[in-house]
Amino acid sequence: PVRVELHLTTEQQAATRAMDENCIRDVNLYLYGDTEYHFYFPSVSSPLVFNVLPGNYRSYAIANAGQDLGDKNAFKIQFYETAVDVMESSDAIPMTDRGTLAVDGAGRCTPSSLRVTRSAAKIAYTIEVADAVAPSLRLRSVQFCNLPRTIRPFDSGSISSTVEANYYDGEAMPVGNERRTAGTAYLFENLQG
């Protein structure tokens, strides 16, 4: 085996006060080639350092899972699910990357970094009652409904579940101003259509 140093980067977007969109607390790294590897980094410093045999690998990185996900073969990783509970309890957005890595005999890795992307969409909203209807319409609360409980970040193109139990309604958030409210939420993709 050779020693490899692999850098991990995130989408460079401004962080909000509610959640640090670029925070990486832990990483599970899976490599599939002639030999399969799983590495868990419970705290992340750059670069990630590990030992593998030289070769070509399909790589899967899962950031902010909050735990060592254990070994998963190349088939099972396609169906890995992350739950909204993980994101809400850790205050960190799940992030993933899928790609290929080539490791030479000197431990040089191409590409030399993985770029993880958020598995949840940032929704910035503003809701305002028009003057024409203000006498008869007041804002009381905002609630997101029909939210997926889980997503499969590596199962691209799959249609969201049609099972009602796989969805939930978010908490109704009281509004202090009856005419206008704004906020930010992080939601998993819903491909129900």
Residue ranges and their predicted role:
Residues 3-20, 127-132:
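Short amphipathic, basic-aromatic surface patches that mediate peripheral association
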Residues 16-75, 131-193:
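Tryptophan-paired
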Residues 113-120, 187-192:
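Conserved "repeat-terminator" motif of extracellular CCP/Sushi domains
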Residues 36, 40-44, 67-111, 174:
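Structured interaction patches on ligand/partner-binding surfaces of diverse proteins
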Residues 1-4, 121-123:
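Short structural boundary motif marking the start of a folded domain
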Residues 115-134:
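Surface-exposed interaction/gating patches
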Residues 16, 111-112:
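Short, recurring structural edge motifs at helix starts
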Residues 49-51, 100-102, 113-115, 143:
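Generic structural detector for well-ordered beta-strands
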